[in-house]
């Protein structure tokens, strides 16, 4: 140890240096400032500068329109809410605004008008319902009509109903003028059962009138019920109609009698309905049954 020990080296100086370095370390007098290289690189990167610039561009500035510009735009919107490119360019030259701004203004204005129409239309639909008056469609419901007009209307309706119920009011043949004489003759000669039975036909007609049947149909009803009366009627009318024989008026066979009755009905009724045809068939069947009996 003594060989390597330097006598000129002072131990006190070494201790003093150690104490100074400790004090400097404690009080941070000569301490180096360390910086983070990554953070310094991130702050100085150009990408962050670009993103900040883009965020600044995204924030648009709102265009403030003057009163003159708004009046011109509103006037153009009243003319047409969908202006073409030529009209937008003219408005841009007139209002000193870019054409893109004018296009955006028209889009916003159309949206506002559609929203206002949706809010106004329910109110406008409900309001005229209070003032509307419903006209009287049916004449009977109109209370302001006079009683004379009501009477004439009822008379017209009754006439229409009568025309509908009577399909052939104009084709009715007149009553035979010889019928009263025949009835009187039948009343005088009431000894035979056929004449007495035939004279009862007018009373039956009075008791059971047929408004839709003519006199010929009524005569045919009586003849069907009383065939003897038909023979007496034909014998009395032979003097008036000498050209017609009794055999032609009253055939011997029942089938020919049916044909004669049908011919007589068809001559008076050229147009017959299904109901009349069925009545004729039924009456012809009754006549044949009476003849067979």
UniProtKB/Swiss-Prot annotation:
Residues 117-144 are annotated as: Disordered. The lineage of its organism: Eukaryota, Metazoa, Chordata, Craniata, Vertebrata. InterPro entries: HD, Homeodomain-like_sf, SEBOX. The gene is sebox. This is Homeobox protein SEBOX. One of its GO terms (biological process) is cell differentiation. PANTHER family: HOMEOBOX PROTEIN SEBOX (PTHR47777:SF1). Induction: Regulated by the Nodal pathway. Residues 58-117 bind DNA. Coiled coil: none annotated. Belongs to the paired homeobox family. It comes from Danio rerio. The keyword Mitochondrion does not apply. The keyword Cell membrane does not apply.
């Amino acid at each position: 140890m003594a060989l390597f020990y330097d006598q000129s080296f002072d131990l006190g100086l070494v201790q003093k240096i150690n104490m100074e370095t400790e004090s400097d370390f404690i009080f941070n007098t000569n301490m180096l400032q360390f910086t983070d290289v990554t953070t310094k690189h991130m702050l100085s990167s150009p990408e962050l500068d670009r993103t900040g610039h883009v965020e600044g561009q995204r924030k648009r500035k709102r265009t403030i329109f003057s009163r003159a510009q708004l009046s011109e735009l509103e006037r153009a919107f009243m003319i047409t809410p969908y202006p073409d490119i030529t009209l937008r360019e003219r408005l841009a030259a007139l209002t000193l605004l870019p054409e893109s701004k004018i296009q955006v203004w028209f889009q916003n204005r159309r949206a506002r008008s559609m929203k206002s129409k949706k809010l106004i239309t329910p109110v406008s639909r409900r309001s005229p319902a209070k003032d509307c008056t419903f006209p009287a469609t049916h004449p009977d419901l109109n209370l302001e009509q006079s009683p004379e007009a009501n009477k004439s209307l009822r008379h017209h309706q009754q006439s229409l109903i009568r025309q509908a119920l009577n399909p052939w009011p104009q084709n009715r043949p007149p009553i035979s003028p010889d019928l009263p004489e025949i009835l009187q003759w039948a009343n005088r000669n009431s000894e035979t059962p056929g004449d007495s039975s035939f004279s009862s036909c007018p009373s039956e007609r009075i008791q059971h009138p047929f408004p839709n049947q003519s006199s010929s149909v009524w005569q045919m009803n009586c003849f069907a019920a009383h065939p003897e009366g038909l023979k007496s009627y034909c014998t009395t009318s032979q003097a008036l109609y000498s050209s017609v024989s009794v055999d032609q008026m009253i055939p011997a066979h029942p089938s020919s009698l049916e044909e004669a009755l049908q011919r007589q009905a068809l001559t008076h009724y050229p147009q017959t309905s299904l109901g009349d045809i069925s009545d004729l068939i039924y009456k012809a069947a009754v006549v044949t049954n009476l003849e067979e009996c």
